[in-house]
Amino acid sequence: MNDSLLSNGHAPPLRQATVDRQTKETKVHVELTLDGNGLADNHTGIPFLNHMLDQLCAHGLVDLRVQASGDTHIDDHHTNEDVGITLGMALDQALGDRRGIQRFGHFVAPLDESLVEVALDFSGRPHLNYGLQIPTQRVGTYDTQLVREFFVALVNHSRMTLHIRQLDGMNSHHIIEATFKAFARALRMAIALDPRRAQQIPSSKGVIQA
């Protein structure tokens, strides 16, 4: 059986979403295609965040376009958080009722001396267990506290449970990049369509909600 086909022999609908979000602090536009090829066009005004989003595309095989502007003359906090919010909203919309997905994902990614484990569940119940110990306050101009803020925003608006655990690492850039790579691969597993499940909701309750 072709894994890309439903039980009725038809291809599944394209899973994608476009979300625009604007506040007095930021303006964010996100286009997301889950069944993509890793295409990335990310311009957030925060170079390091662009780099991490590119990793998400390359290793999660999602297509992602993010255009963001904000009050980065103050600091990166609002833009970083609002990109996470808008991406989470797009992910939630693209997944719909979660029908037919694997739902769970888990991956351990090494990057030189760093090793990060990520497990996630599209449970409908937002929860983040964040276990990174990043040794420096900044990577270039990027405030490393914003890594957690990005994932908090993403988790809350995609309605996922996410565990991030640092198993090893000393270099801040390596730790963060390993995190995004592990997240990307876990995401790729979780959003994959399960041909054995066809169009069923992946829950014994028959519904996934908060």
Curated annotation (Swiss-Prot):
Chief site of localization: cytoplasm
Biological pathway: Amino-acid biosynthesis; L-histidine biosynthesis; L-histidine from 5-phospho-alpha-D-ribose 1-diphosphate: step 6/9
Annotated TM spans: none
Compartments, as annotated in UniProt: Cytoplasm
Gene Ontology BP annotations: L-histidine biosynthetic process
EC class name: lyase
GO CC term (a single one): cytoplasm
Any one GO molecular-function label of the UniProt entry: imidazoleglycerol-phosphate dehydratase activity
UniProt EC number: 4.2.1.19
Keyword annotations of the record: Amino-acid biosynthesis, Cytoplasm, Histidine biosynthesis, Lyase
Family: Belongs to the imidazoleglycerol-phosphate dehydratase family.
Protein name: Imidazoleglycerol-phosphate dehydratase
Protein's organism: Thermosynechococcus vestitus (strain NIES-2133 / IAM M-273 / BP-1)
